[in-house]
């Protein structure tokens, strides 16, 4: 058995937890409507939610993920001008994620990350999510950036787990073979299946 030198973390449900905070979610909905110039917040969010369903079906069926601009231009607000969408797409995606809950590092997560790094492991994040900027901003703001040697996001590479290529990309960026890496995640169908297919 190979000695483990690298560890990949999933985010949602593993390293980060979403908490239902009504005031936080309502503020995100208001900001989205403001950015879009929509006078009726509830009607606007109902429309976005309805349009998100076929996007989600496509993403799960095809193991693909759209970047911020494509998400809004093709799926959620296709009637809006290109210039407007390019201006607001990143914040719209961020706020839509906030509308789904307030996220924070799982209890004990920082201690685990620090402990592994101190023992010489190379660390990476491999996650399926919409939003190109949120995770990089979060890592900077919470001063976690120095602990991670690579971050592979479906919204940036445009493929989703269980596609093993996400894990192969992570291994290449760590400079390690898949057999030298481990994956910490919560979803058997997406995370564990993808990692095993990549020989992690």
Segments from the language model and where they lie:
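N-terminal helical cap/lid subdomain that shapes the substrate entry/recognition surface
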Residues: 2-119
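Substrate-recognition/cap helix-loop segment adjacent to the acidic, metal-dependent catalytic center
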Residues: 110-124, 129-152
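Surface-exposed amphipathic alpha-helices with a cationic face
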Residues: 113-120, 171, 192, 196
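Glycine/Thr-rich beta-alpha phosphate-binding loop at enzyme active sites
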Residues: 150-162
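Conserved Lys-Pro-Asp/Glu-containing loop-to-beta segment of HAD-superfamily phosphomonoesterases
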Residues: 160-192
């Amino acid at each position: 058995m190979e000695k483990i030198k690298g560890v990949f973390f999933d985010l949602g449900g593993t390293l980060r937890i979403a908490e239902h905070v009504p005031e936080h979610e309502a503020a995100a909905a208001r900001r989205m409507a403001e950015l879009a110039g929509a006078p009726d917040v509830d009607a606007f969010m109902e429309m976005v939610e309805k349009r998100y369903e076929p996007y989600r079906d496509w993403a799960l069926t095809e193991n693909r993920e759209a970047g911020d601009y494509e998400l809004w231009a093709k799926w959620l607000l296709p009637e809006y001008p290109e210039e407007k969408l390019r201006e607001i797409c990143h914040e719209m995606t961020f706020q839509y994620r906030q509308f789904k809950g307030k996220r924070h590092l799982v209890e004990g997560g920082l201690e685990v990350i620090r402990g592994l790094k101190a023992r010489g492991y190379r660390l990476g994040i491999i996650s399926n999510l919409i939003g190109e900027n949120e995770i990089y901003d979060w890592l900077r703001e919470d001063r976690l950036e120095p602990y991670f040697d690579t971050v592979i996001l479906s919204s940036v590479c445009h493929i989703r787990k269980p596609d093993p290529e996400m894990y192969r990309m992570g291994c290449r960026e760590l400079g390690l073979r898949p057999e030298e890496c481990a994956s910490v995640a919560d979803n058997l169908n997406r995370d564990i299946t993808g990692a095993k297919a990549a020989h992690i």
